[in-house]
């Protein structure tokens, strides 16, 4: 069997190759862009209660990567359409092996005629007989003669001829052509300089540049996507206690922000000025402010990671509070939650605070008449808008909290405990009672079933999922994703023992979270604090007290053995008492039977009968 590699001369297979390659890139990117993770069946989109109140001129800073993605998708789909059209309208010329055509005779020719015709062809095309090889080579002549010989054998051999008549494929070595789905002009000598230039461009410039850029990025950027110079600037200034102003100064010194204003002599001071104008809600309409705020989430997330690495609780708290103030544009020295409502001015918020109305639920608990009395300078529509926005602001609620160890009734030294949290989103005036643990909680049947689900799914979350709308942040220059950060603090040492992690998509029903952590290495009673802080809203933080009783394994075993022995003794005493009571009751029954027999006189009946 001979084989031959050749390029796509007809231009049929090369478009197919391009179509497959383009589709492998365009289809997954289209799916991730249009559908994405938000299209999961587990998630439910909720109505955006802030939609009609959001600023119409909200400037959403879109990254260039998304613009390039859409351009790439448009060009990719145009290429897919063009290639599909070209393939659909092309005609493939099939080379079917036909011995009659090779010999140049009509189908159905008799065997004798085939033999006579073959003799004439063999004399004419035998490689040793061909003298004038003009525009041909000896290899081509030999190849042609072999085809003639195979065709002759296919028509003169009875079995082969029968196979060919029945199936159209004689039992002879077939000519197999293995092609390469590339156009023929690639292999032509006059185009070699362009092909070599293309290879040199791809493998000599583009590929080294991409690898170098990736390597440089991995060396100069952290996993939080900030420059290493930013982290080097922050680390020496991390202390046990950092105020909001000090953290704002660290935030402004990041390279991600200072690089946005390269023409400023003192970029940090300039950024601080823009940030203070933003926090005080001064209308500057400065483009640099929009750029700074568009990078704030990335920088603040990195600042939180650095604060967590040091383990101090106070900086972690203040980073999240700074995040809230920047998103809501609230001064650092005036953390009033009611400033998040539209139209409400600072002096009116202070007046409400004097009346002990400082939180969103307290504001919503006011009747319409009280609201009008306390806020007489606002129109009816403005007051209505305030209430609707306040009703749409979510806040996290802890429904239940337990510290448990899998398959163990007690928490022992060195074990891996799990903080089980049942959380939900509350709205309006709904208030969930404060939850705390005293260390005496035990696992219920539901906890055991949930633990089995955790092990099966290898997940830390159970329950419903609900996609929340973007945060109500009219002074922020882009849509902001609502999230809560959960971490556990040891208040005695002011240290973070469970690092913060963010959660989103909290439903109105219930969702259970499982947070594993290491039990202290010594026995005793330990008190912790559970912190749940929002990255979007001021005054919606939750702090719950946790108590954990840790027991020593050896002491616990002795106690359990003593309890087991005590239980056995109690059971034996109960059995002896029961047996003694049974013997006493048997004696009484015997005595009573004897008395009954002595009192019985059969003559009484006889006397009565005689009478």
From Swiss-Prot:
It holds the Pfam family Sec63. It is a multi-pass membrane protein. Keywords: Chaperone, Endoplasmic reticulum, Membrane, Nucleus, Phosphoprotein, Protein transport, Transmembrane, Transmembrane helix, Transport. InterPro entries: C2_domain_sf (IPR035892), DnaJ_domain (IPR001623), Ig_E-set (IPR014756), J_dom_sf (IPR036869), Sec63-dom (IPR004179). SUPFAM superfamilies: Chaperone J-domain, E set domains, Sec63 N-terminal domain-like. The chain crosses the membrane at residues 11-31, 70-90, 192-212. One of its GO terms (molecular function) is Hsp70 protein binding. Residues 1-10, 91-191 are lumenal. Residues 32-69, 213-611 are cytoplasmic. One of its GO terms (biological process) is post-translational protein targeting to endoplasmic reticulum membrane. Signal peptide: none annotated. It comes from the Eukaryota. Acts as a component of the Sec62/63 complex which is involved in SRP-independent post-translational translocation across the endoplasmic reticulum (ER) and functions together with the Sec61 complex and bip1 in a channel-forming translocon complex. A cycle of assembly and disassembly of Sec62/63 complex from sec61 may govern the activity of the translocon. sec63 may affect sec61-polypeptide interactions by increasing the affinity of targeting pathways for sec61 and/or by modifying sec61 to allow more efficient polypeptide interaction. This is Translocation protein sec63. The gene is sec63.
């Amino acid at each position: 069997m001979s084989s031959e590699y050749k390029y796509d001369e007809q231009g049929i297979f090369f478009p197919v190759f391009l179509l497959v390659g383009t589709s492998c890139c365009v289809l997954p990117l289209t799916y991730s862009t249009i559908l994405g993770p938000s299209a999961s069946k587990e998630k439910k989109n909720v109505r955006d209660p802030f939609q009609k109140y959001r600023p119409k001129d909200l400037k959403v800073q879109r990254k260039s990567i998304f613009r390039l993605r859409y351009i790439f998708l448009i060009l990719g789909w145009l290429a897919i359409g063009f290639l599909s059209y070209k393939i659909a309208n092309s005609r493939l010329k099939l080379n079917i092996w036909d011995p009659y055509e090779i010999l140049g005779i009509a189908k159905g020719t008799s065997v004798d005629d085939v033999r006579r015709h073959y003799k004439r062809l063999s004399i004419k095309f035998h490689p040793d007989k061909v003298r004038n090889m003009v525009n041909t080579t000896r290899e081509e002549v030999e190849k042609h003669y072999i085809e003639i010989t195979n065709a002759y054998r296919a028509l003169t051999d009875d079995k082969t001829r029968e196979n060919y008549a029945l199936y159209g494929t004689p039992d002879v070595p077939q000519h197999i052509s293995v092609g390469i789905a590339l156009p023929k002009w690639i292999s032509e000598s006059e185009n070699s300089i362009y092909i070599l230039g293309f290879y040199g461009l791809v493998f000599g410039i583009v590929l080294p540049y991409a690898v170098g850029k990736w390597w440089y990025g991995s060396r100069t950027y952290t996993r939080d996507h900030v420059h290493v110079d930013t982290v080097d600037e922050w680390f020496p200034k991390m202390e046990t206690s950092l105020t909001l102003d000090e953290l704002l100064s660290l935030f402004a010194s990041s390279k991600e922000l200072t690089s946005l204003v390269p023409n400023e002599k003192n970029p940090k001071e300039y950024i601080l000025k823009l940030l203070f104008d933003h926090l005080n809600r001064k209308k500057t309409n400065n483009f640099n402010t929009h750029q700074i705020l568009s990078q704030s989430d990335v920088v603040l997330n990195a600042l939180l990671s650095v604060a967590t690495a040091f383990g101090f609780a106070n900086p972690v708290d203040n980073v999240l509070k700074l995040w809230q103030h920047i998103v809501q544009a609230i001064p650092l020295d005036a953390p009033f939650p009611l400033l998040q409502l539209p139209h409400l001015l600072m002096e009116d918020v202070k007046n409400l605070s004097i009346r002990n109305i400082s939180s969103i639920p307290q504001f919503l608990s006011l009747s319409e008449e009280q609201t009008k009395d306390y806020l007489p300078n606002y129109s009816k529509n403005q007051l209505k808008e305030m209430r609707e926005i306040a009703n749409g602001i979510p806040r996290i609620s802890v429904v239940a909290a337990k510290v448990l160890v899998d398959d163990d009734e007690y928490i022992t030294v060195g074990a891996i405990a799990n903080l089980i949290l049942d959380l939900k989103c509350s709205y309006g005036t709904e208030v969930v009672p404060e939850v705390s643990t005293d260390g005496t909680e035990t696992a219920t049947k539901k906890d055991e079933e949930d633990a089995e689900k955790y092990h099966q799914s290898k997940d830390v979350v159970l329950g419903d999922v609900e996609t929340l709308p973007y945060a109500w942040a009219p002074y922020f220059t882009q849509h902001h994703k609502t999230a809560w950060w959960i971490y556990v603090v040891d208040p005695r040492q002011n240290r973070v023992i469970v690092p913060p992690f963010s959660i989103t998509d909290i439903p109105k029903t219930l969702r259970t979270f499982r947070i594993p952590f290491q039990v202290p290495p010594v026995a005793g009673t330990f008190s912790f604090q559970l912190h749940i802080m929002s990255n979007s809203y001021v005054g919606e933080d939750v702090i719950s007290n946790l108590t954990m009783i840790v027991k020593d394994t050896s002491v616990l075993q002795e106690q359990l053995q003593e309890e087991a022995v005590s239980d056995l003794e109690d059971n034996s005493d109960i059995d002896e008492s029961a047996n003694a009571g049974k013997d006493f009751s048997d004696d009484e029954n015997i005595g009573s039977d004897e008395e009954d027999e002595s009192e019985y006189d059969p003559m009484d009946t006889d006397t009565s009968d005689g009478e």
